[in-house]
């Protein structure tokens, strides 16, 4: 019963690999020297973007807890392939505006941000790519504006068509029995998760990135549930060393971003889950009909746990899905953990393969 509820929750909420020992078997060629930065106004906020290249527009939407930098291995490769690649700091993150009110982070606002971004860039069409929460935004943007987004690539979080019936996801999740709490329920009360995470930002980011990755031992890999008394970070002991895909410089960059922005804006995305559900009735049975691609890690907590049902039903919700790929040995941060493989899949899809 609990497992079935969890599989349903993800749909409602989001309207080679690593060898043993953590050794990388692929080495990304990442050169950010040609990446430019600027601010654009979209949907009433000032958005900070990283961009490179010229040609058809590709928008890369990151998730939690990330920034434009999570696409550092993809931006140069896609630009070299002949695309204008734009990776924004999403609303509430990094150098992008972070409105105070919780309702400023609802899905319609987030979709409006990327729609407005296309127009602010002077374009009429775009390919949209998203990871984690960014995959939810990308999917909803493609569903709501098929005239604007010509194709969609989703990483880690599957899109599921809205189904009839049910109840607000967080209300349902809060009633689940057992001693542990679902992390998205823990994020609901303003100020609680922020206070825990902002005590030691670098440690917080490292814990979340490591324990949802393919490097974390199976016994300690984050499942989405934890002892509320210990807190989410208290349940995740510090790893002895960084995984091969995350350097000290990478971690320092992320920590700097969240010291600047704080966690309130990003956590406010979660605080709109039930409101997104209440406002999403018009999306009943809505399918993402553009050509699409799905990529995730074989060890991703979404795929192995509460999102498995959405993954298994992808072909129903994405009738023009060209391929769905699980990369062996990898976890939730797929474009960072397996950049060479992800880049190959992106380029193959973009070339029509």
Please annotate each region the language model reported:
Residues 27-35, 46-47, 93-129, 133-322:
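Flexible "cap/lid" subdomain of the alpha/beta-hydrolase fold that forms the substrate-access gate
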Residues 43-51:
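A short loop-to-beta-strand scaffold at the N-terminal edge of the catalytic core in hydrolase folds
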Residues 38-42:
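Short acidic-hydrophobic surface loop/beta-edge motif
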Residues 51-97:
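Conserved HGGG/HGGXW glycine-rich cap/lid loop of the alpha/beta-hydrolase fold
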Residues 21-23:
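Boundary at the C-terminal end of the N-terminal hydrophobic targeting segment
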Residues 8-17:
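Bacterial N-terminal signal peptides
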Residues 1-4:
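Positively charged n-region of N-terminal signal peptides that target proteins for export
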Residues 321-353:
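Catalytic active-site module of serine/aspartate enzymes centered on a nucleophile-bearing elbow/loop
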